């Protein structure tokens, strides 16, 4: 066993000197077990002079210089396979729920590995129905694709991800992995209990490295979840759903330790290796000939600035983006998805079909024209518009409200039952609005409803 001693402690970063010149490899896990301290470190740099610089996976409180350190000889390894389902883990793959330890004979895989080779990748394109109108119509998700939910603080990223878990995980019936990266422990706890109540937990593995954890854990916990998902894809040929909330915290944790590791900061103080780290993670989240990983990632946008290097780097890796907009939350439109800024490479006639494509484009054109007219309305009022433009505004407002709907996961707050709307229903509803079939119905009848039939019902109640 290769042993060394702690020579320097700088918060979450620890320097270890090994005698005899036998240094552990980069990414190897080192272990410290002494009195109260039980700590795992990951090798980040070789400094020369027989010394390595490491990042701690839990708090370094109580650690002193001179403490003995063991090299485990391999990267952090976490349990994989069916034993992980229904359980909750930390970054090291240790069970943190109340159901006891994971048996020692369960297979463990290292969290660092190469992305699949180019010839192994799958090129199939198939739409994943979410039951959320604005997503299915304007920025449809691809099965086996990468999806980003972008938004600032408090615009509903976590609620949207929970609704997607509720809709897709239950409809899909396959295996899901949830990685909670640097978010609120309360939300993780709520999600665990919701999933337990609905029974989805039996087919889900959950991994958490929350806000209160040191940056080492927050930086690596996404890889822990990904390793579990990769096993189901590669060894069992499953179609896996991987939820990551929040991928920005992965970058943020990297920037916290970057300066302590002695690297020069780059733009906005981020680590110079930002694009590389993001690429190493994202390239592993992919679909192969054996199975698929569909990943849905929440992306926090600092100060609502989409040009910030963290969200800007994430954009490049995604197949579909769902952009959440604070302006819409202020109007009471939930989910607050911006229909003009959200994108998907699946929105083409070859993939979604001619009718769906035409309806989606007409919806976007109507909303874009309404946006352009808003300045005129603000200055001169509605009366100065031409009859044609008045009709555009009239329909655009109905479309805007019809893009909202109630969520199952928000039922306890709103008191309204959630709705799941199939894609065909969604396309039919918007087509009827564009054709003017519902021009005579009051605007408020379109707000927070499911299908177009619900709108007609609401209108009858309002007019009664």
UniProtKB/Swiss-Prot annotation:
InterPro entries: AAA+_ATPase, ATP-synt_VA_C, ATP_synth_F1_bsu, ATPase_a/bsu_AS, ATPase_alpha/beta_chains, ATPase_F1/V1/A1_a/bsu_N, ATPase_F1/V1/A1_a/bsu_N_sf, ATPase_F1/V1/A1_a/bsu_nucl-bd. Produces ATP from ADP in the presence of a proton gradient across the membrane. The catalytic sites are hosted primarily by the beta subunits. NCBIfam families: atpD. One of its GO terms (cellular component) is proton-transporting ATP synthase complex. CDD domains: ATP-synt_F1_beta_C (cd18110), ATP-synt_F1_beta_N (cd18115), F1-ATPase_beta_CD (cd01133). This is ATP synthase subunit beta. It is a peripheral membrane protein. Coiled coil: none annotated. Gene3D superfamilies: 2.40.10.170, Bovine Mitochondrial F1-atpase, Atp Synthase Beta Chain, Chain D, domain 3, P-loop containing nucleotide triphosphate hydrolases. It is found in: Cell membrane. F-type ATPases have 2 components, CF(1) - the catalytic core - and CF(0) - the membrane proton channel. CF(1) has five subunits: alpha(3), beta(3), gamma(1), delta(1), epsilon(1). CF(0) has three main subunits: a(1), b(2) and c(9-12). The alpha and beta chains form an alternating ring which encloses part of the gamma chain. CF(1) is attached to CF(0) by a central stalk formed by the gamma and epsilon chains, while a peripheral stalk is formed by the delta and b chains. It comes from the Bacteria. PANTHER family: ATP SYNTHASE, ATP SYNTHASE SUBUNIT BETA, MITOCHONDRIAL. Its main location: membrane. PROSITE patterns: ATPASE_ALPHA_BETA (PS00152). Belongs to the ATPase alpha/beta chains family.
